[in-house]
A protein has these predicted regions:
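Alpha-helical residues within the helix-turn-helix
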Residues: 23-24, 41, 62
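A short LG(V/I)-centered, amphipathic sequence patch enriched
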Residues: 40-57
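Helix-turn-helix DNA-binding elements, focusing on the entry/boundary residues of the two helices
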Residues: 17-18, 36, 50
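Alpha-helical linker/hinge and terminal dimerization helices associated
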Residues: 42-43, 64-86
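Interdomain hinge and pocket-entrance segments immediately C-terminal to HTH DNA-binding domains
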Residues: 82-100
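Residues within the DNA-recognition helix of helix-turn-helix
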Residues: 28-31, 35-38
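Short alpha-helical elements of helix-turn-helix
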Residues: 1-15, 33, 62-65, 69
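Short helix-boundary/capping micro-motifs
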Residues: 11-26
Length: 100
């Protein structure tokens, strides 16, 4: 499961449309549809129902939203921690070289 797939799902919910979410994220509508299908297959549940009027959450999709948000938030924390660790390494290396 890829982060971008989860982000697409959340964007589709926010926009109320797979085509709108695809456009906002720079995907073709076909690619957006494939992303959702792949995510549903990986999770083993149908997340959304589609109709000419838009999309609607399934019960399974609704139950997974808190976990998806938590996972995306945790990944963001990891990214920040990694950047901070890299910055610390750079500062340490510069200080060590300056004392030599």
């Amino acid at each position: 499961m890829e982060t971008r797939d989860l982000q697409f799902f959340i964007k589709a919910l926010a926009s109320g449309s797979l085509s709108r979410a695809s456009e906002e994220l720079g995907y073709s509508v076909s690619a957006g549809s494939h992303i959702l299908e792949r995510l549903e297959k990986q999770l083993g549940v149908k997340l959304l129902t589609r109709s000419p009027r838009g999309i609607a959450l399934t019960e399974a999709g609704e139950s997974l939203i808190p976990e998806i948000h938590a996972l995306l938030a945790q990944e963001e924390k990891l990214d920040v921690a990694a950047l901070e660790a890299a910055a610390w390494e750079t500062r340490f290396a510069v200080t060590a070289d300056a004392q030599a």
